[in-house]
Amino acid sequence: QTPQWATGHFM
């Protein structure tokens, strides 16, 4: 379960 902020931060 990945937060929305983590999606743009790591990817």
From Swiss-Prot:
UniProt entry tagged with the keyword Secreted: yes
Entry keywords, A to Z: Amidation, Amphibian defense peptide, Pyrrolidone carboxylic acid, Secreted
Residues found modified as Pyrrolidone carboxylic acid: 1
Tissues where this protein is expressed: Expressed by the skin glands.
Main location: secreted
Subcellular location per the Swiss-Prot or TrEMBL entry: Secreted
InterPro entries per the UniProt record, alphabetical: Bombesin
Keyword Secreted in annotation: yes
Gene Ontology cellular component list: extracellular region
Residue numbers of Methionine amide PTMs: 11
Annotated GO biological process: defense response; neuropeptide signaling pathway
Family note: Belongs to the bombesin/neuromedin-B/ranatensin family.
Listed name of the protein: Ranatensin-C
